[in-house]
């Protein structure tokens, strides 16, 4: 019968084309087949006979590809493919009303695969061949959610205990929960934050739930790391390393009929006890994690306070009298509020009453102390603030550390790991331990018997571009974990999405993306334009990870915050610069010397092409002879292959390579050789610098040219500023660095003093200005800058012989201040002073003279000063223009 007009399903199979006639009589079907004249009878419920189909000439709108057309017979869809074959399926699994723009995205990726895919010996794209296996998008696959983001995401209710046999921290626990409960979840894993541990625990939980999981990456190194950890726990009997043909062949040849010895069985009562215990331990563990992270943050804050105090004592011309400090042992906030009150109270009877109140009632200072010059009084208060803040931080650290030791004595985390491993092993014993012999699979079984294969080997390893070829075209994994997803290109990632019901995407948007061959750019751009691709699917603009984050902004995402790898001084630059200070640094600072050093080669053109002999000499003659670190634990990173080759010849056994080759690796000492004389987008790329820095565990040395070092508003310049500030060595300058911890606390105390928590000044104009300056500095162009209000001029400008006597007196007055100082975050160096000039106030003779003095002082010390008027518009633009000019 004509299969374009009729559909006959007999005993669940489409038999339309093999039937000559069909007739219903008395609740019985009479069917005559085309190859015989005999008529057979079938019970009514064994046959489905449908007519008058709805024809779809654009099957891509149903998420169907490689097809001429599709016919809808009520709840069935029959697809007629280009190659002459047909397929019948229920319409419930199809995507209804696919928008043409969404269909275009898939077709765009499919055509891109012919351009960007690796070619075989016949010049055929392997990616393209895999794309040709995708006939349709089904609701169950993650690919349908990515291409149709408005489609509801499936959620999973998990009643089983959350296992953590590989160890755990707070962020990792959230990552596991997200992975198990959500169809799509994202793990942002900065370097050294335990991405592999998170992946292992997700694998463990998927096994415990009886599921299978595929672990893929753009290279084998990342997945090999996961495999080796599973090997350590004796779990590789569950793994199949597939992907390319050689891997499949090797795996099939090495199969064994036998299972390993399983752990001794445990009773159901014990299993129930462990399950309940794990649920309770997971709750108790959160208290440990919270306290552990609080201690780490407190250590970071204490370190910053001590470093700033060190700069304060070096920079200030201190006349501190220790016996007065004993009278100022008060809460740090109270000290600053008192200082501000003294600054804002004019000399006279009101000042006298304030002093009486301070030392008679509040017991702060004494009459002798308050007879000192106001400048000295303020200096004592600021010194006491640091001492008190540091003492308080140490007290909190001591208290929290003792509390953590008490909690750790309960061995909560050890029991959690032990019970998790026991339950996992028991579930695997039940799943496999009763089998007498393990089946042996053939290559054909991978295509026709994938479900049984993945029951036996529920952990599959592959590269991202090869995972589609591992099994039959319609097979879906329960879970797919894509590691190093920032390095996976969009086309390959989309292909991987087609093989999974649930996906966990692991990567770091702050690290290197995939590299796009520049010779392909024009072809790619032409396709993007022709298919009218939305920006978040644009191959040139996005890696797979960044595209998913853009397409699915509401997908559960967690940043792994706890960092274990790098010395705190190394990682804290990346933390401040790239991660918004969200990382919790759990590595230890034991006061090691020379953790960070910058070597600046003299001015001059030392680079020739893409190599720099001066840098090679610095490494060979200055850095390496003075290190005690073993050669195998030293790595040299350079942007260019030519410099890499020359370095390798010069330093022999020490490994030199490009930053792309170092991603995912680590060394005790990393030497970054920037090579070029001039800063450019390539060597100053934020992601390259982030990767390069975070390879170093114990020490990092940076080599730059004089020109690169002094190029403003660059990532490398920010890093050099950071290194300089961390060295805590005095810097000869007419402008002092800003004590930002002191003056941030000062601004908060000032707000309390003014009884307006959001106000930093009694003048509305200054409050408005502060708000719009903060808004401007939030923009990417100014991410390395911050602003502080009401900074005393003497804290910024060095009082030297270039100033007149009148200017010195004005500058030394404690009440003389800048309305705002915009400064570099990394070394606290002032960039710009900002004054807010009200018309009436600033046009008095007295104020005009003060403004003249301030302008002259700033000019002599090369500190740019911008005056913003309360009577003029476009002040925001003036500030932006000034910042742009300075940077």
Question: Across the structure, where does each feature detected by a protein language model lie?
Answer:
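ASCE P-loop NTPase helicase motor core
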Residues: 57, 83, 152-265, 322-330, ...
């Amino acid at each position: 019968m004509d299969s374009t007009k009729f559909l006959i399903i007999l005993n669940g199979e489409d038999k339309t084309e093999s039937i000559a006639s069909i007739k219903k009589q008395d609740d019985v079907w009479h069917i005559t087949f085309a190859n015989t004249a005999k008529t057979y009878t079938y019970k009514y419920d064994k046959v489905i006979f449908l007519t008058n189909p709805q024809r779809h000439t654009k099957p891509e709108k149903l998420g169907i590809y490689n097809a001429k057309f599709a016919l809808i017979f009520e709840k069935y869809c029959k697809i007629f493919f280009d190659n002459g074959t047909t397929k019948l399926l229920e319409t419930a699994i199809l995507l209804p009303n696919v928008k043409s723009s969404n269909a275009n995205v898939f077709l765009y990726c499919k055509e891109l695969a012919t351009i960007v895919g690796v070619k075989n010996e016949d010049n055929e794209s392997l990616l393209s061949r895999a794309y040709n296996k995708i006939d349709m998008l089904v609701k169950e696959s993650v690919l349908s959610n990515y291409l149709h983001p408005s489609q509801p995401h499936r959620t999973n209710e998990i009643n089983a205990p959350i296992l953590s046999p590989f160890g755990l921290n707070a962020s990792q626990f959230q990552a596991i929960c997200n992975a198990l409960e959500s169809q799509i979840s994202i793990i942002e894993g900065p370097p050294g934050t335990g991405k592999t541990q998170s992946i292992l625990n997700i694998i463990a939980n998927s096994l415990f739930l009886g599921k299978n999981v595929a672990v893929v990456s753009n290279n084998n190194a990342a997945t090999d790391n996961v495999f080796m950890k599973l090997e350590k726990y004796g779990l590789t009997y569950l793994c199949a390393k597939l992907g390319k043909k050689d891997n499949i062949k090797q795996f099939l040849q090495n199969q064994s009929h036998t299972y390993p010895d399983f752990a001794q069985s445990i009773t159901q009562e014990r299993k129930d006890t462990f399950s309940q215990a794990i649920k309770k331990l997971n709750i108790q563990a959160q208290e440990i994690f919270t306290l552990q992270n609080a201690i780490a943050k407190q250590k970071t804050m204490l370190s910053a306070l001590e470093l700033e105090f060190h700069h304060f004592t070096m920079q200030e011309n201190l006349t501190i009298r220790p016996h007065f400090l004993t009278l100022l042992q008060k809460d740090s906030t109270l000290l600053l509020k008192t200082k501000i009150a003294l600054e804002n109270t004019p000399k006279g009877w009101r000042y006298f009453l304030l002093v009486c109140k301070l030392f008679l009632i509040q017991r702060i200072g004494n009459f002798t102390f308050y007879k000192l010059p106001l400048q000295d009084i303020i200096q004592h208060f600021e010194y006491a603030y640091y001492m008190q803040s540091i003492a308080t931080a140490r007290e909190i650290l001591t208290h929290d550390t003792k509390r953590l030791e008490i909690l750790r004595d309960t061995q909560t985390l050890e029991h959690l790991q032990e019970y998790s491993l026991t339950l996992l092993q028991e579930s695997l014993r039940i799943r496999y331990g009763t089998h007498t012999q393990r089946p042996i699979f053939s290559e054909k079984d991978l295509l026709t018997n994938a479900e049984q294969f993945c029951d036996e080997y529920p952990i599959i390893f592959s590269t991202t571009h090869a995972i589609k070829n591992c099994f039959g075209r319609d097979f879906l994994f329960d879970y797919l974990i894509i590691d190093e997803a920032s390095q996976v290109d969009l086309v390959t990632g989309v292909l991987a999405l087609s093989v999974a019901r649930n996906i966990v995407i692991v990567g770091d948007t702050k690290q290197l993306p995939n590299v796009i061959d520049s010779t392909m750019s024009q072809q790619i751009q032409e396709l993007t334009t022709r298919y009218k691709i939305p920006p978040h699917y644009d191959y040139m603009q996005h890696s797979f990870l960044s595209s998913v984050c853009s397409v699915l902004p509401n997908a559960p995402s967690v940043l792994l915050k706890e960092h274990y790898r790098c010395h705190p001084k190394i990682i804290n630059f990346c933390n401040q610069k790239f991660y918004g200070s969200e990382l919790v640094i759990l590595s230890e600072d034991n006061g090691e010397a020379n953790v960070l050093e910058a070597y600046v080669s003299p001015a001059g053109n030392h680079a020739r092409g893409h190599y720099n002999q001066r840098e090679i000499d610095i490494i060979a003659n200055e850095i390496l002879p003075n290190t005690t670190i073993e050669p195998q634990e030293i790595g040299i990173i350079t942007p260019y292959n030519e410099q890499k080759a020359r370095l390798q010849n010069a330093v022999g056994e020490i490994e030199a390579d490009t930053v792309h080759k170092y991603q995912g690796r680590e060394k005790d000492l990393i030497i970054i050789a920037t090579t070029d004389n001039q800063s450019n987008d390539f060597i100053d790329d934020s992601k390259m610098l982030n990767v390069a820095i975070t390879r170093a565990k114990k020490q990092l040395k940076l080599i730059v040219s004089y020109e690169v070092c002094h190029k403003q508003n660059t990532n490398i310049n920010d890093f050099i500023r950071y290194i300089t500030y961390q060295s805590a060595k005095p810097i000869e300058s007419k402008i002092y660095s800003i004590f930002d911890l002191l003056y941030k606390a000062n601004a908060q105390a000032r707000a309390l003093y003014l009884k307006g928590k959001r106000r930093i000044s009694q003048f509305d104009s200054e409050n408005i200005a502060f708000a719009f300056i903060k808004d401007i500095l939030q923009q990417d162009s100014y991410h390395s800058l911050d602003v502080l209000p009401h900074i005393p001029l003497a804290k910024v400008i060095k009082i030297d012989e270039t100033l007149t006597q009148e200017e010195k007196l004005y500058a030394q007055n404690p009440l003389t201040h800048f309305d705002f100082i915009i400064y570099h975050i990394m070394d606290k160096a002032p960039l710009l002073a900002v004054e807010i000039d009200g018309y009436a106030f600033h046009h008095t003779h007295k104020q005009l003279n003060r403004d003249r003095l301030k302008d002259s002082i700033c000019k002599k010390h090369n500190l740019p000063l911008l005056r913003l008027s309360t009577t003029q518009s476009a002040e925001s633009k003036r500030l932006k223009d000034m910042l742009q000019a300075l940077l």
